[in-house]
Amino acid sequence: MSKPVITRFAPSPTGYLHIGGARTALFNWLYAKHCGGKMLLRIEDTDRERSTEAATAAILDGLTWLGLDWDGEAISQFERAPRHREVAEELVANGKAYYCYASPEELEEMREKARAEGRPPRYDGRWRDRDPSEAPAGVKPVIRIKAPRDGETVVHDAVQGDVRFPNKDLDDFIILRSDGTPTYMHAVVVDDHDMGVTHIIRGDDHLTNAARQTIIYNAMGWDVPQMSHIPLIHGADGAKLSKRHGALGVDAYRAMGYLPAALRNYLVRLGWSHGDDEIMSTEQMIEWFDVKDINKGAARFDFQKLEAINGLYMRSSDDQALFDALVAVLPEIEGGKELAEALDDKGRAQLLLAMPGLKERAKTLVELADGAKFIFASRPLALDEKAASLLNDEGRAVLKPVYPVLEAVGEWTAESLDAAIRAHAEAEGLKLGKIAQPLRAALTGRATSPGVFDVLVVLGREESLARIGDQIG
């Protein structure tokens, strides 16, 4: 019987959960779910100077917001240092690693010699077969792996295929420093083995690491997990992703008003596809996702595509769910606090009532919040430039006879209001737009908004008439 699939996401808590890390987590999560397995979370916090609790919290928050749940408790790599030392000593005892007493001066000499000969700097193995009795007094050694010197190390990769590394290029790298702390290369292997990880899915910038880690697995006689090194994300211009392209933290995307489901949908398509399917549910992603379908080429990050997908998700969202998502993000978006303060019981009811019209015009929750501002605007309304031009003398003259028409409407519904204004337009020989445009400007202070009859209903009879009255004098 085959082992259950166990993947892992292993971020370093030296900053936020960036978008590349979020995609790596998503791929690990989807593959584990697809196979009925588990995704574990390991915090690689061995860099004590740069690792912070705040960054760890931001990573956990980012994963939770994205809906990527992990199995069991998050594991701290730093806390496992005694186990890393134990395995390093075991490798020495088994003749697979050795103590190296080379001084910093000797190592610099090796580097200088390599440079002079046009070779990449490599440790020359001088303590590989020396008797430990020759060790200089008072020098704390490092532990180096006895890497094979001939042949090649092959990384069997589900995405990249077989990748071959000549062993002469890999040298006897350090697995335990002289102060007893493990190197990243060693700690990762020990942790992945002890956690039972069967599949490693990570960025292809780790491909060279995979060769060195394979050497440690082989030295311990452990099974090497199935590797999948996924291509990095580039900007739309093909250059390496930077902050100007969108290499931001997941928290920034939340504050920009993206929905987690939409961001998941966008990220899964960065380097993986299922035919021509663009929009897919989480259930479909889980059913369809397989590492063998990941592309080798770098994916390109495209904000416009993300916005378009987010807009689709917003328009298909339940009004109450979208309302809840908006309220949750208000403290984080520009101008959101003022909107949040306006949401008393009446304000909440009005915003929910306006949601069908608002979501049709917004691609993000930030745009949705901006579109809702007219509901809570103070009288007399400040008019934007286009609204002011619509409410010139001609616009006000068109609007003046509309006031008594609206005042006379019995049932204040979109249907009744529509019928009354259309009848008035016909009687005056005007096109509906000729009335709707200055009416919208008077009601919202803007030239664009949800449908004008929906706006009248959301504002209510009293507020609507008062706003029109402000403009016609």
Swiss-Prot record:
Placement of sequence motif 'KMSKS' region: 240-244
Intervals of motif 'HIGH' region: 11-21
Binding site for ATP: 243
Main location: cytoplasm
Biased amino acid composition, Basic and acidic residues: 113-133
Keyword Glycoprotein on entry: no
Catalytically driven reaction(s): tRNA(Glu) + L-glutamate + ATP = L-glutamyl-tRNA(Glu) + AMP + diphosphate
Enzyme type, top EC level: ligase
Region described as Disordered: 113-136
GO BP, one annotated term: glutamyl-tRNA aminoacylation
GO MF entries: ATP binding; glutamate-tRNA ligase activity; tRNA binding; zinc ion binding
One GO cellular component, as annotated: cytosol
Keywords: Aminoacyl-tRNA synthetase, ATP-binding, Cytoplasm, Ligase, Nucleotide-binding, Protein biosynthesis
Localization (cell): Cytoplasm
EC id: 6.1.1.17
Record family assignment: Belongs to the class-I aminoacyl-tRNA synthetase family. Glutamate--tRNA ligase type 1 subfamily.
Function noted in UniProt: Catalyzes the attachment of glutamate to tRNA(Glu) in a two-step reaction: glutamate is first activated by ATP to form Glu-AMP and then transferred to the acceptor end of tRNA(Glu).
Alphabetized HAMAP family for the sequence: Glu_tRNA_synth_type1
Entries under NCBIfam families matching the protein: gltX_bact
Subunit details: Monomer.
UniProt-recorded name of the protein: Glutamate--tRNA ligase 2
Species: Brucella canis (strain ATCC 23365 / NCTC 10854 / RM-666)
